[in-house]
Amino acid sequence: MTAPSVSAISAYRQLLRATRIAFKDDYRILLAARSEARKQFNAHKRTAVDTPMQIQHALETASILRHNIVQGIRDAEKEDAKWELRIHDEIERGDNDSVKIGGKNVKIEKACS
């Protein structure tokens, strides 16, 4: 195997792990996300000039899935049911003030609730 194919395999595995974390217990979405990942990787099987960019895209997608996607569930039987968010350990936490600051260093003085 060449080096790009080894890193492509690694990126694919990271993407599958990220889908497992982001879409835990939501099998319909999990299967759809994995199917899309497989389809994209199969569409770009041959090593080309843009292969490193595609591998980087897969790694960035895995990072977004792992750190920024939160799923919510609601009891469908109750009309006034509240949403429960499934926030796992790897979810990026912050507050609105840190978003407004941009690229500057942020000191968070209180825990997010």
Curated annotation (Swiss-Prot):
Q: Which domain of life is it from?
A: Eukaryota
Q: What is one Gene Ontology biological process annotated in the Swiss-Prot or TrEMBL record?
A: mitochondrial respiratory chain complex III assembly
Give this protein's Gene Ontology molecular function annotations.
Answer: protein folding chaperone
Q: Where does the UniProt entry say this protein principally localizes?
A: mitochondrion
Query: Which Pfam family, any one, appears in the UniProt record?
Result: Complex1_LYR
Indicate whether Transcription appears among the record's keywords.
no
Instruction: Report the subcellular localization.
Output: Mitochondrion matrix
**Any idea which UniProt keywords this protein has?**
Chaperone, Mitochondrion, Transit peptide
Recorded family membership: Belongs to the complex I LYR family. MZM1 subfamily.
Oligomeric form and interacting partners: Interacts with RIP1.
Q: What does this protein do?
A: Assembly factor required for Rieske Fe-S protein RIP1 incorporation into the cytochrome b-c1 (CIII) complex. Functions as a chaperone, binding to this subunit within the mitochondrial matrix and stabilizing it prior to its translocation and insertion into the late CIII dimeric intermediate within the mitochondrial inner membrane. Modulates the mitochondrial matrix zinc pool.
- What is this protein identified as? Mitochondrial zinc maintenance protein 1, mitochondrial
Its source organism is Talaromyces marneffei (strain ATCC 18224 / CBS 334.59 / QM 7333)
This protein's gene is called MZM1
